[in-house]
Swiss-Prot record:
Catalytic activity, as annotated: di-trans,octa-cis-undecaprenyl diphospho-N-acetyl-alpha-D-muramoyl-L-alanyl-D-glutamyl-meso-2,6-diaminopimeloyl-D-alanyl-D-alanine + UDP-N-acetyl-alpha-D-glucosamine = di-trans,octa-cis-undecaprenyl diphospho-[N-acetyl-alpha-D-glucosaminyl-(1->4)]-N-acetyl-alpha-D-muramoyl-L-alanyl-D-glutamyl-meso-2,6-diaminopimeloyl-D-alanyl-D-alanine + UDP + H(+)
Domain of life: Bacteria
Gene Ontology BP, a term: peptidoglycan biosynthetic process
UniProt KW keywords: Cell cycle, Cell division, Cell inner membrane, Cell membrane, Cell shape, Cell wall biogenesis/degradation, Glycosyltransferase, Membrane, Peptidoglycan synthesis, Transferase
Annotated membrane topology: Peripheral membrane protein
Pathway: Cell wall biogenesis; peptidoglycan biosynthesis
UniProt-recorded name of the protein: UDP-N-acetylglucosamine--N-acetylmuramyl-(pentapeptide) pyrophosphoryl-undecaprenol N-acetylglucosamine transferase
EC number assigned by the record: 2.4.1.227
Organism: Rickettsia akari (strain Hartford)
Gene name tied to this protein: murG
Entry's localization field: Cell inner membrane
Pfam families assigned to the protein according to its UniProt record, in alphabetical order: Glyco_tran_28_C (PF04101), Glyco_transf_28 (PF03033)
NCBIfam families registered for this protein in UniProt: murG
Family per similarity comment: Belongs to the glycosyltransferase 28 family. MurG subfamily.
C-alpha cells in the first residue's frame, strides 16, 4: 500500500480541507499520514481513517529563538518522514508545515503544494521551486513567481463531505416569499426549512476565533438599524459569538422580537448553511470554497491582519465576478451593513445571480487534487 503525507496547520481553515482530501485518498486505497500541530486536537476524529502526527513548531518573531526551534522540528520531521517512506507529500501552506517540507526536500520526497487562497502565501512561494506541481483554487492567483506558472494546475478548493451533500439544495429567489409591509421578498428553496421559519429571511453570521468579537458588536447594531427602517421585516439570525458576548446579543434580538440562535461554535455548519439565505463572514479560503460549492451568497468582511492580506484578495475576486460582496473592516459601519442587507432582501434577484456565479466556479477539488497526486506518483515529472 502506497503512503501519502498531508502537511497542514491546525486551524480549521487548513485542517478541514486537508481531511477532506485525506478521506478521498483513503477511499482510493492509500495509507494517509497527516502531520499537523497542537491546535488541531479539538478537531481530530480517529474514525477518519487517517494517521495523525503532531509536530509543533513554535512561532517566534525573535530569529534567535525561531531558528533553534525550526532546526529541532526539521530533525524530528526528517526522522518521521524517513520512517513513513511516503510516495508524496502535499503541503497546505502556513508556518507549521515548514519543518515537514524541509524534511521532504532533504529526503527527496515528491512535493505537491496546494494554495487555497487567491494570493500565494510566503511558505508556499518559498517551496514552489521544489514542488512537482502547484494546485490552486482560483484561476487567478497573485504573487506567483514566473518559474512556477508551468507547474500550476487549477483543482479548485476542497470541501468537506457533509457540505458537499448540500448540493441537492437549490438556491432560488422565486420560490417562497416573506412579507414586509406591502413588498414581497422572495426566499430560497430549501427542502429542510421548518414550518415556523417558512417566511423568515435567515442571516448566518460567523467569524471564527478572529472575527466573533467584531461581529458581536457590529451585527446587532446593524440589525437594530435595519429593523428601525423596516419594522415589519421577519428575520431569523444565526450568529456565532463568544460566551461573554451572548447575553448582550440575545437581549438585543429579544427586544427586537426576532428569531435568533446564538452559539459559541457550530459543530455541523451544514445545518446552518441549509437555513441561510445570506452569510456574513470573514473571507478565509475554506469558508469561500464551502459557500462556492453550495452557491450560498455572502457579505465578506476580510480580516485585515490575515497574512499577505489574502482575505481581501479572496473576497474582492468574488465581488469582481458578482458572486459576493466585500466590505472592508476599516470602512464598515453598522449603517452601511444595514443598508447592504436591506438592499439584498429587497432585490432577491441579486442574490440569485450571485448564487449562479458562485456555482460557475465550483470544482470537485478533492477529486481533481487526488487525480493530480496519483499522476505525480505514477507518472513522475522532472
Amino acid at each position: 500500500m502506497k503512503k501519502i503525507i498531508l502537511a497542514a496547520g491546525g486551524t480549521g481553515g487548513h485542517f478541514f480541507p486537508a481531511v477532506a482530501l485525506g478521506e478521498e485518498l483513503v477511499k482510493r486505497g492509500y495509507e494517509v499520514h497527516f502531520i499537523t500541530d497542537l491546535r488541531c486536537q479539538k478537531y481530530i476524529n480517529q474514525n477518519l481513517g487517517l494517521i495523525f502526527h503532531i509536530l509543533d513548531l513554535k512561532r517566534s518573531s525573535n530569529i534567535f529563538l525561531f531558528l533553534p526551534n525550526l532546526s529541532i522540528a526539521i530533525l524530528k520531521a526528517i526522522k518521521l518522514l524517513y520512517n513513513i517512506r511516503s510516495s508524496a507529500i502535499i503541503g497546505f501552506g502556513s508556518y507549521p508545515v515548514i519543518s515537514s517540507m524541509f524534511a521532504a526536500v532533504f529526503l527527496r520526497v515528491p512535493i505537491i503544494i496546494h494554495e487555497q487562497n487567491s494570493y500565494l502565501g510566503k511558505v508556499n512561494k518559498f517551496f514552489a521551486s521544489f514542488a512537482k506541481r502547484i494546485a490552486i483554487s482560483y484561476e487567478e492567483v497573485k504573487n506567483l513567481p514566473e518559474f512556477a506558472k508551468s507547474k500550476i494546475v487549477v483543482t479548485g478548493g476542497i470541501v468537506r463531505e457533509n457540505i458537499r451533500e448540500l448540493d441537492s439544495i437549490v438556491y432560488s429567489a422565486s420560490h417562497r416569499g416573506l412579507i414586509t409591509g406591502s413588498k414581497k421578498i422572495k426566499k430560497r428553496l430549501d427542502s429542510v426549512v421548518t414550518p415556523q421559519n417558512d417566511k423568515l429571511f435567515t442571516i448566518f453570521i460567523f467569524g471564527g476565533s478572529q472575527g466573533a468579537t467584531l461581529f458581536s458588536e457590529l451585527i446587532p447594531a446593524s440589525i437594530q438599524i435595519l429593523m428601525q427602517k423596516q419594522p415589519n421585516l421577519k428575520l431569523n439570525i444565526i450568529q456565532q459569538a463568544a460566551l461573554d458576548d451572548q447575553v448582550k446579543i440575545k437581549d438585543i434580538y429579544s427586544k427586537l422580537n426576532i428569531n435568533y440562535e446564538c452559539a459559541e461554535f457550530f459543530d455541523n455548519m451544514a445545518l446552518q448553511y441549509k437555513e441561510a439565505d445570506v452569510v456574513i463572514s470573514r473571507a478565509g479560503a475554506s469558508t469561500i470554497e464551502e459557500l462556492t460549492y453550495i452557491g450560498l451568497p455572502a457579505i465578506f468582511i476580510p480580516l485585515p491582519s490575515a497574512a499577505d492580506n489574502h482575505q481581501y484578495y479572496n473576497a474582492k475576486l468574488l465581488e469582481d465576478k458578482k458572486a459576493g460582496w466585500c466590505l472592508e473592516q476599516s470602512d464598515i459601519s453598522a449603517g452601511k451593513l444595514a443598508d447592504k442587507i436591506l438592499d439584498l432582501i429587497s432585490n432577491p434577484k441579486i442574490l440569485e445571480e450571485a448564487s449562479k456565479n458562485l456555482l460557475k466556479r465550483r470544482k470537485e477539488g478533492h477529486v481533481l487534487l487526488s487525480d493530480l497526486i496519483e499522476g505525480v506518483i505514477y507518472h513522475p515529472v522532472a
